[in-house]
Amino acid sequence: MKMELKVKPIENGTVIDHISGSKALKVYKILNIEEKLPITLALNVPSKKGVMKDILKIEGLELTRDDVNKIALISPDATINIIKEGIVIKKFKVNLPKRIDGIIKCTNPNCITNKENIEGKFSIEQKNTLKIRCEYCEKFINSIIISK
């Protein structure tokens, strides 16, 4: 007998779908979600496209633009669903902007942003294979450190 697990839909909040497989915990961590909020986390769920995906449902959370940008850095194919009174009122794919300020930390120890209290500014040079350049020291970074 095939068993299915049913997850109760959320009433008001956000569903982050199509998160790259095994990256939902990283998304959860960078969003600094209040511990009191009800959260449903599904890892490595088969998608209709035949690839594994993760899903994160957060009751009572509205994402900021910075939150969406952080998600796009981790999982560029993610989809955001905004839920009000049990109905999807808005659905969109995350999209990396051309520039990101303040949410990434430069990995160059000699960068001015790491020596002084200066907010990082980065240009997205390539989206498909993520290539990000610090606007202060010009270093290309390949491991992203999200600022809190």
Swiss-Prot record:
Q: Does the keyword Zinc apply?
A: yes
Instruction: Tell me one GO biological process term.
Output: 'de novo' pyrimidine nucleobase biosynthetic process
Any one Gene Ontology molecular-function term assigned to this protein's record = metal ion binding
Instruction: Tell me the disulfide pairings in this chain.
Output: none
Entry annotated with the keyword Zinc: yes
Q: Name one GO cellular component term.
A: aspartate carbamoyltransferase complex
Cofactor field: Zn(2+)
Kindly list the positions annotated as binding Zn(2+): C106, C111, C134, C137
Keyword annotations for this protein? Metal-binding, Pyrimidine biosynthesis, Zinc
The free-text function statement in the UniProt record for this protein reads: Involved in allosteric regulation of aspartate carbamoyltransferase.
Xref: NCBIfam families = ATCase_reg
Which named protein is this?
Aspartate carbamoyltransferase regulatory chain
Q: Which gene encodes it?
A: pyrI
